[in-house]
Swiss-Prot record:
InterPro entries the UniProt entry points to: Indolamine_dOase, Trp/Indoleamine_2_3_dOase-like
Role, per record: Catalyzes the first step in tryptophan catabolism in order to supply de novo nicotinamide adenine dinucleotide (NAD(+)) via the kynurenine pathway. Plays a role in the cellular response to telomere uncapping.
Gene Ontology CC annotations of this record: cytoplasm
Protein name (Swiss-Prot/TrEMBL): Indoleamine 2,3-dioxygenase
Signal peptide residues on this chain, from the entry's feature table: none
EC number per UniProt: 1.13.11.52
Further comment found in the protein's record: Present with 149 molecules/cell in log phase SD medium.
Keywords carried by this UniProt record: Dioxygenase, Heme, Iron, Metal-binding, Oxidoreductase
Phylogenetic lineage: Eukaryota, Fungi, Dikarya, Ascomycota, Saccharomycotina
Cofactor(s) annotated in UniProt: heme
Pfam family, one: IDO
Catalytic activity annotation: D-tryptophan + O2 = N-formyl-D-kynurenine; L-tryptophan + O2 = N-formyl-L-kynurenine
Amino acid sequence: MNNTSITGPQVLHRTKMRPLPVLEKYCISPHHGFLDDRLPLTRLSSKKYMKWEEIVADLPSLLQEDNKVRSVIDGLDVLDLDETILGDVRELRRAYSILGFMAHAYIWASGTPRDVLPECIARPLLETAHILGVPPLATYSSLVLWNFKVTDECKKTETGCLDLENITTINTFTGTVDESWFYLVSVRFEKIGSACLNHGLQILRAIRSGDKGDANVIDGLEGLAATIERLSKALMEMELKCEPNVFYFKIRPFLAGWTNMSHMGLPQGVRYGAEGQYRIFSGGSNAQSSLIQTLDILLGVKHTANAAHSSQGDSKINYLDEMKKYMPREHREFLYHLESVCNIREYVSRNASNRALQEAYGRCISMLKIFRDNHIQIVTKYIILPSNSKQHGSNKPNVLSPIEPNTKASGCLGHKVASSKTIGTGGTRLMPFLKQCRDETVATADIKNEDKN
């Protein structure tokens, strides 16, 4: 490996070789970020898929009866996707969201998981997922980005019409306010975070323009830091209407995927159709948010692979890189593009004498560290503490927890599990992973003597 240091002009020349990304080319909005400017569809337009809509709307009641949801889904015809869906991306997203909800309900209903999805779900789910460039199960996109509606489209506030009091979910597993709130806090998070994209591109344009005095770079960094601070506060709003025990015992089991699920009787994952292949996928997770990974790219935060944190148990696999596969194709491609041209941290390290620049960048890192501290606090309250409690609870009594690695087939949610072993819905060990992300964020601030030999 060549350890020769790269001079400032060389760094800038290297990144100038490729144009900066244009948000709209990647289905990203300057006003709403990774949320579409158009609201998600609340129903498919064709009556052909009316049964899908009826079942997903009725999931909260169907899941109250043993195997009821499975018997209803098993009675469905296998439907092909027609032009009403194939010709409109919002129809595709709606179909994908519906099928993801039904798939997870079918697998995890009644506490004893099934390892085969019926053809009536498997075939259209595989097709919609392939077209959208996402895995065939419920993801952050289907649960959050494409699963909300506004209650008053005329209501305009600081965040347009997407304030928490003006949005609600389209579908949930449990019908609880807690589950809706869990998704909606992330919707608002994404809306606030749209400013991060604009500030980041402002900084990169200023660096390329050779802005003397770095005024625009500093201004962009200050705006970015202020927005990350707002994101931290938005995250803590989870506590307002989502109870930890309701989340952990009633909601979270349905969010699990089929990775690391041998203890639940899914050693090969789930088979898609009676004649299909077994596939292994991680469940819906905030690690699948393109916004969070955008912040890391902009600020130059590097995350290392760790076998204990990977959902695949492979030290060569970086969990956050893995999660890019769960994002909509265009958003994933945006991250790759941004990563190839982003040189903010390098630029700051080359201008160590500019105190205002150093302080502005340092504040961004400090705010991102606080955000990750808050995330650890939320995870502790909503996952670690309930997992260590003796309370038994679920949408049904004696329901197994698919997200506890030591749960046995004859057991139930109530036994004690060590916090370091607690597995996230994405299949990774939560606290070690989150603390590593936080520590790697802090380490990013140390740039004083970088690139000096």
